[in-house]
Curated annotation (Swiss-Prot):
PANTHER family: VALINE--TRNA LIGASE, CHLOROPLASTIC_MITOCHONDRIAL 2 (PTHR11946:SF93), VALYL-TRNA SYNTHETASES (PTHR11946). It comes from Methanosarcina acetivorans (strain ATCC 35395 / DSM 2834 / JCM 12185 / C2A). ValRS has two distinct active sites: one for aminoacylation and one for editing. The misactivated threonine is translocated from the active site to the editing site. Pfam families: Anticodon_1, DUF5915, tRNA-synt_1. It catalyses: tRNA(Val) + L-valine + ATP = L-valyl-tRNA(Val) + AMP + diphosphate. Signal peptide: none annotated. Catalyzes the attachment of valine to tRNA(Val). As ValRS can inadvertently accommodate and process structurally similar amino acids such as threonine, to avoid such errors, it has a 'posttransfer' editing activity that hydrolyzes mischarged Thr-tRNA(Val) in a tRNA-dependent manner. A motif ('HIGH' region) lies at residues 47-57. This is Valine--tRNA ligase. ATP binds at K524. Its EC number is 6.1.1.9. The gene is valS.
Length: 869
């Protein structure tokens, strides 16, 4: 092999910049045409384009890239697409901040243009970070949800689902964020425990307890448990609501908890989901006391225009003044918050668009999908089981996919766009036909679609749905975080079933969250945020990718620790030193030499290493098939450092530098095979380093090569056992030299090995000594040569006399003292008096004599090693 100069130190940034410039990214492209390879389509998460590709994104994309690179090497036609989920409130807020406007101060089209421009710039920033981290994205299959080429599919999916009866329009209670002024789905509600007050209020016949006195204007009934005898005489009677004066009926319902508060509750429209259930069940009237901005309406009387907080304070004051409020108690309450702004959500009844939830179909599809880890499926099952309301998909914003709907001004009928009209914005275009009533005057739908309506068709989009390509659903895998199982995973399954009647993917692999170095969730307020750019600048992309691989098992949260990155960087240098040493001995070795190398020319330690190497390939393949990145990379790193560097290279140096051409050729073959195989195994994890390694084996990219196959013929327990013995013997001899203060390359007179059938050449080379295999069992004579007093025993007993006892012991014949110790009692004379000692008072040092020579014997399992001095 030819060898260019290999520097001693590995310059990661220089290498990574070189390959970023050299790589032809078309090698990552998916082939839509006829291809003998099985397809492997990844339903990649489209991140929100904030301009910051944060460390949580980076961890997820590391996982995806490990999968994509591995599957390509396994012979799959891989698609690793990249999408961008553009629409959403944060962009609207940022545009308002940048331009010093509100969205209602400019035309809708102009505001959307501002949002698009900001988003496009943010995408470019994030794309640069992704390229720097070495992700093998198929950029020929990039998609941007704000582009007409994508949102036309979102609109088509809406039209088809509406026509098929999956979507409907209704005035129905929905979760509402007063701050964002939009409806939100239940999946977008997050819960937090907060302290509130439980207020005890006199009604004219019963006392009620409520946490929402500000909604008394919307009280439409009072409920008690039918088994609660305290109120049985009042059930069905009218009750007057204090301050507001409306009369409501006392109803009995088993959902009321008699133990809570007074056992009587106020039903308002709407304080919570239970109010909605009762409202529907009993056909109660609807009183809208709260508007979309979170202020009280005319229904609240003198409290009109107040915020909820202001109204609560005023109502409580008035109840106290009138003598209706007779007690208050602190209560810890689970409060639903908007996932975007943390504002407590309200429930308003507004005309909205909904998607019907197919509970049974979603659960069945979830069972057909393979989950990694398996226990994550329970999260989807639990969420599906708790879904009482359909998915509210309409939002009161501007920067989102328009709902392709108009309303006839004359008869009020819905006019839905035909597919041939799409993409379309009903606020800028009118229908291309008249209403069934004959009218041509329409009001456009001003609401837009929930952004999950865009991202929930990613599996359909990347599989070729509604394109010139053949449909390839289901895709093979969905990689995503556990925090969006109830949204992205849930909605994608729902939509794939509704539109195509198929599951969206064969498998789903779940990643955890990234925690800061302090173990807490990363946040600017805690000052524990680390960016991928910080790591790549200080260390390298490959070091960052190693952290991603070994940080934790699939599904678990991963803590970012700088020491893990430092360890990763050290491994790169260690692996580089291994590679550099190996290549220095392969200058006269050609790949053809490896193809024709006879296996019987291998020595024991060669077969030992190749057996372990093939076991490593087998382990790595099985673990990566199960998406176990941490155990895979740890196994590769452990083999390279501990098996190859610490043992094999030390054992074969004698052959590599020696005069035996056949032994040297065998070692060269093993070095070539092992380093080349390691470059392939490392390729999915540290692509820059692996490419640099492989570039001296071939002009082709390592990322276009085939994953190494297991050679079962080279796996041998017998070879490994013999190799372990060679390793252990060599290690014991090295420790022996170290204990005596000898240099490790200092020669010994001779090493004799009994009870072993192994090659001795590598032991001789590693110990710089003559080594001989001996037949039969060795005979040893153990001659006592010194009495060593045990001062831990003698000192406390004899104190000042201990020195005299030691002197007397050392004057005795070691053999005689040994004989006395064996009998259980030692008697010596100290200053003319007999002194008796226990056997533990002394240690007898013995010399080992074998064949008339003084030797040392080393304890090695399965063999006896004799060192001739």
């Amino acid at each position: 092999m030819t060898e260019s100069e290999i520097p001693k130190e590995y310059n990661a940034n220089e290498v990574e910049e070189k390959w970023m410039e050299k790589w032809n990214l078309s090698m990552y492209h998916f082939n839509w045409g006829e291809d003998p390879r099985p397809q492997y389509i990844i339903d990649t998460p489209p991140p929100y384009p904030t301009g910051n590709f944060h460390i949580g994104n980076a961890l997820n994309w590391c996982y995806i890239d490990y999968i994509a690179r591995y599957k390509r090497m396994r012979g799959y036609n891989v698609m690793f697409p990249q999408g961008w989920d553009c629409h959403g409130l944060p962009t609207e807020v940022k545009v308002e901040e940048i331009h010093g406007i509100t969205k209602n101060q400019v035309p809708r089209a102009e505001f959307r243009k501002m949002c698009r421009e900001l988003t496009a710039g943010n995408i470019e920033k994030m794309r640069k970070t992704m390229l720097r981290l070495g992700f093998s994205v198929d950029w020929s299959n990039e998609f941007v949800t704000m582009e007409p080429s994508y949102f036309v599919k979102t609109q088509k999916s809406f039209v088809r689902m509406y026509n098929d009866g999956h979507i409907y329009h209704e005035d129905h209670p929905v979760n509402w964020c007063p701050r964002c002024e939009t409806a939100i789905a239940f999946a977008e509600v997050e819960y937090e425990s907060r302290q509130t007050k439980l207020n005890f209020v006199h009604f004219d016949k019963v006392d009620i307890a409520t946490t929402r006195p500000e909604l008394m204007a919307a009280c439409v009934a009072v409920a008690v448990n039918p088994k609660d005898e305290r109120y049985s005489q009042h059930i069905g009677k009218e009750i007057t609501v204090p301050i507001f004066g409306q009369k409501v009926t006392l109803i009995a319902d088993e959902a009321v908890e008699p133990e809570f508060g007074t056992g009587a509750v106020m039903i308002c429209t709407f304080g919570d989901k239970q109010d909605v259930r009762w409202w529907v069940k009993y056909g109660l009237p609807l009183v809208k006391a709260l508007d979309k901005q979170g202020r009280m309406t005319k229904a609240a009387g003198k409290y009109e225009g107040m915020t909820l907080a202001e109204c609560r304070e005023a109502v409580i004051a008035d109840l106290k003044a009138a003598g209706f409020l007779y007690d208050q108690k602190s209560l810890e309450q689970n409060v639903g918050l908007c996932w975007r702004c943390d504002t407590p959500i309200e429930i308003l009844s507004e005309p909205q668009w909904f998607v019907k939830i197919n509970h049974e179909g979603i659960l069945k599809a979830a069972d057909e999908i393979k989950w990694y880890p398996e226990y994550m499926k329970v999260r989807l099952q639990n969420w599906t089981g708790t879904m009482e309301w359909d998915w509210c998909i309409s939002r009161q914003r501007i920067f989102a996919t328009p709902i392709p709907i108009w309303y006839c001004k004359k008869c009020g009928e819905v006019m839905i766009a035909e597919e041939s009209w799409l993409p379309i914005d009903p606020n800028e275009n009118t229908p291309k036909k008249a209403c069934a009533c004959g009218s041509t005057e329409f009001e456009p739908e001003t609401d837009v679609l929930d952004t999950w309506m865009d991202s929930s068709i990613t599996a359909l989009h990347v599989s070729g749905w509604e394109s010139e390509h053949e449909m390839r659903l289901p895709t093979q895998i969905r990689p995503q975080g556990h925090d969006i199982i109830r949204t992205w995973a849930f909605y994608t399954i729902l939509r794939s079933l509704a539109l195509e009647g198929k599951r969206p993917w064969d498998s789903i692999v779940i990643n955890g969250m990234v925690l800061g170095p302090d173990g807490h969730k990363m946040s600017k307020s805690l000052g524990n945020v680390i960016s991928p750019e910080e790591v790549t600048t200080q260390y390298s992309a490959d070091a960052f990718r190693q952290w991603g691989a070994v940080g934790g098992s699939t599904g678990s949260d991963v803590m970012f620790r700088w020491k893990d990155v430092v360890s990763a960087s050290r491994f790169l240098q260690k692996m580089w030193s291994i590679y550099r040493f190996s290549m220095s001995h392969l200058k006269d070795f050609e790949p053809a030499d490896a193809e024709n190398f006879p296996p019987d020319a291998l020595l024991t330690i060669d077969r030992w290493l190749l057996s372990k190497l093939n076991k490593l390939v087998d382990t790595a393949t099985k673990e990566l098939d199960g998406y176990q990145f941490d155990s895979t990379f740890k196994a590769i790193r452990g083999f390279a450092w501990e098996v190859l560097a610490d043992n094999y290279l030390e054992l074969v140096k004698g052959r590599l530098y020696g005069e035996d051409p056949e032994g040297r050729k065998a070692a060269q073959y093993v070095l070539y095979t092992t380093t080349r195989t390691l470059s392939l195994l490392l390729a999915p994890f540290i692509p820059f380093f692996a490419e640099e390694m492989y570039s001296r084996f071939s002009e082709e990219s390592v990322h276009t090569q085939t994953w190494p196959a297991v050679n079962e013929k080279l796996i041998s327990e017998e070879a490994e056992a013999a190799g372990e013995m060679i390793k252990e013997i060599t290690g014991e001899v090295r420790r022996y030299k170290s204990d005596l203060g000898m240099a490790l390359n200092a020669p010994l007179k001779k090493i004799e090995i009994y009870n072993a059938e192994i090659d001795t050449g590598d032991i001789a080379g590693a110990t710089n000594s003559e080594v001989e295999l001996m037949a039969g069992a060795p005979s040893f004579e153990y001659v006592p040569v010194e009495v060593k007093p045990n001062m831990g025993f003698l000192g406390p007993r004899f104190r000042k006399e201990a020195g005299a006892v030691v002197k007397a012991l050392q004057a005795e014949d070691p053999a005689a003292i040994e004989a006395q110790a064996a009998s259980g009692k030692i008697t010596i004379t100290v200053n003319g008096e007999a002194v008796k000692l226990e056997p533990e008072a002394v240690e007898i040092r013995k010399e080992v004599i074998s064949g008339g020579r003084e030797v040392d014997v080393l304890d090695v399992k399965g063999a006896v090693v004799v060192i001739v001095r």
